[in-house]
Amino acid sequence: VTKPALSERELMDFEKAGKLEAFNTDGLRSLIYTMGHIPDMKEKTLRYPGHVDLIIALQQAGFFDSAPIQVNDTTLSPLDFTSKLLVSEWKLGETEEEFTVMKVIVKGEGKTITYDLYDQYDPLTQTSSMARTTGYTCTAAVNLITKGMFTEKGVFPPELIGDRKECFDFVLEYLKDRRVHWAKTSG
């Protein structure tokens, strides 16, 4: 079953980030093929409450249309105009503080395991949280290869690398060494 982006909105409370709005987004497409044994999966994006309403308002008003329109003596697409305005406004400043929050919930065989991540801008290294959580994960993967822990050839999605316990544990330890912490709870 495929659900449209921005659908199935729900509010979620996070200890450090507060109340956030979760909604369906399009991503992790490789999971459909690599984790076919899992009957139900969802991926949701988290934003501050009200984000979806603003995006829907822009969409319904035509700001994401790609067909060019005439404005005075200029022809341009609403999407190009919107992108030009919003991308510069949304671009993170060099030392602007931000955070990353993630929750992974795995349910099956009568138990639930939850992984929670909260990370924020590191003023000591002047490294954004997004760089810390994604970049360090990529460099951990490079280290897996250089240390001979992952020797497969070709392109591999992250879930196939993480499917190996020694690789999964290595990545989590690598992140921990850089003060990126996951909390695991079981229930």
Residue ranges and their predicted role:
Residues 1-187:
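C-terminal catalytic/substrate-binding lobe primarily of soluble NAD(P)-dependent oxidoreductases
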